Amino acid sequence: MTVRPIVIAGDPVLHNPTELVDLSAGVTPELRTLIADMVDTLAASGGVGLSANQIGVGKRLFVIDCPDTDLPEGAPMPPEMIATRAGKPGWSSDGVNQVACVINPVLTVDNPPNGRQILMREGEGCLSVPGVQFALDRYDWAQVTGFNEQGKPITLSG
């Protein structure tokens, strides 16, 4: 598809609330094109996540392409792990990265599996603020629900 320019901090589209994506008619060809453009833009950027407003579209969706946190960085998944995850939404076929699109995401940070939340300070970057890393406090667990690129429910957590 198309690699779109990434909007830089200060642009109003990054500061305004995003609009819910209307899925009443299913995933439209226009939405499929937007998602494909976002995936291509993310791949070209070298980032791990991209929201629609970062390419100037004020809609509520994002794409990710992240290393699987259950493995050492860059390590391939063993075949038995691939088999247990095969066909689950949000998993790429290469067995290395978690690749997903989440439409109309809802973030939850309560009810972690271990029963407690821990704040962790880590460095984080943003494609809309190029060349800068920030030390941010994040919970060690979060869950996001929404709809995938086929309009089916998806839940990602970690």
Where is each model-derived feature located?
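Active-site rim/adjacent substrate-binding subdomains
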Residues: 1-158
